[in-house]
Amino acid sequence: MKAVVLTLAVLFLTGSQARHFWQQDEPQSPWDRVKDLATVYVDVVKDGGRDYVAQFEASALGKQLNLKLLDNWDSLSSTVAKLREQIGPVTQEFWDNLEKETEVLRQEMSKDLEEVKKKVQPYLDEFQSKWHEEVELYRQKVAPLGAELREGARQKLQELQEKLSPLAEELRDRARAHVDALRAQLAPYSEQLRERLAARLQALKEGGGAALTEYHAKASEHLSALREKAKPALEDLRQGLLPVLENFRVSLLAAVDEATKKLNSQ
């Protein structure tokens, strides 16, 4: 279990380098990745939910009930935003501590990745070159057919499609062959990288069991500290939600009562 926890931590922490590894972008810290993903997700949910609430309030039923859901939604969004601001520094501290504890292991894995990259780069370059050649060959074969279509207009469209079909299938088959060849070439390096990671973890487990235990203990300690520091912010969120929920409950009961009176009077 400890090895699994450490593996996930290492993969997560080194994952921030993956985009830099293949695309040569600036590396992004783990917290930045988590924060960006969480922010996008929360914003999408918040905006989408607000749109649905606004549509409901604009409907005939929404106007009749007059629940003031949009006001409550905005209050809730404000409370959640406040929670994010309060927890942000605490979570940042957690990731900073975890990064420090796994710095040595991440450096070793970065060296392994760089070594594998140098070995597989020629295969990637060769694949890209062959793919460009196939596309250019396909373009040269298709070009005369395009001119033929312009000359013959619509009556030759079906004939053109019949001629293009085998060419497209040929391109697909040749591309598939190149992909299979690339996969076969890269397989040993992928396995080599997996074995190196397993060896790193096994070395920690056997030759440095104390270090692995220490990683796990410190991670647990950081998580406990995170929970304790987040409690006040979560309590603030709960207190902020109470008026919103009470307002919603009162509005709903009033709407139901009014609807009942109208039904009884008919």
Swiss-Prot record:
Residues found modified as Methionine sulfoxide: 109
UniProt Sequence repeat ranges: 67-88, 89-110, 111-121, 122-143, 144-165, 166-187, 188-209, 210-231, 232-242, 243-266
Pfam (any one): Apolipoprotein
Signal peptide limits: 1-18
Keyword annotations of the record: Cholesterol metabolism, Glycoprotein, HDL, Lipid metabolism, Lipid transport, Lipoprotein, Oxidation, Palmitate, Phosphoprotein, Repeat, Secreted, Signal, Steroid metabolism, Sterol metabolism, Transport
Post-translational modification: Glycosylated.
Compartments, as annotated in UniProt: Secreted
Segments of this protein annotated with the region 10 X approximate tandem repeats: 67-266
Biological process annotations from GO: acylglycerol homeostasis; cholesterol efflux; cholesterol metabolic process; lipoprotein metabolic process; phospholipid efflux
Keyword Phosphoprotein belongs to the record: yes
Superkingdom classification of source: Eukaryota
Protein family: Belongs to the apolipoprotein A1/A4/E family.
Subunit structure: Homodimer. Interacts with APOA1BP and CLU. Component of a sperm activating protein complex (SPAP), consisting of APOA1, an immunoglobulin heavy chain, an immunoglobulin light chain and albumin. Interacts with NDRG1. Interacts with SCGB3A2. Interacts with NAXE and YJEFN3.
Descriptive protein name: Apolipoprotein A-I
Organism: Mirounga angustirostris (Northern elephant seal)
